[in-house]
């Protein structure tokens, strides 16, 4: 039998287990960041991790909304910072997108008045859904470079 593969090389991600996909997401974020960011902004990839509940609340999602995820956000309100690579659970695409957009909107409001540089970072955040349904949010300095690096990493596998 012949299987058609859409999405220019992203088809193989469909054969990954959620755990393998999660690891790929973590690697994509790690490789896209500076050593300093990797040191200070841990990556949440399991609902069992300590800051999971607080992080999910901040992003407007639950563990049930996500099949696989790697998330790194600043829980302190001094920096507009958030990276998320999420494979939504079936029928949760809208919930994930709306939650992440809500996070971006909230960050913009938080920084608009008192930290103009962080407001710019929040304003330039990127939120996109890839062909395979994976949702990518990038809010950090130099967001386009980080975003492109994450995408390249995910597609290279």
Model-derived regions: residue spans:
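C-terminal motif of bacterial Sec signal peptides marking the signal peptidase cleavage site
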Residues: 2-6
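Post-signal peptide N-terminal segment of mature Sec-exported envelope proteins
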Residues: 12-34
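Extracytoplasmic/secreted envelope proteins and their assembly/folding machinery
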Residues: 22-26, 83, 93, 97-101, ...
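Short, compositionally biased low-complexity segments enriched in polar/charged residues
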Residues: 44-79, 95-96
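A short, solvent-exposed beta-edge/loop patch
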Residues: 75, 85, 118-156
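Short Gly/Thr-rich strand-loop-strand
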Residues: 93-131
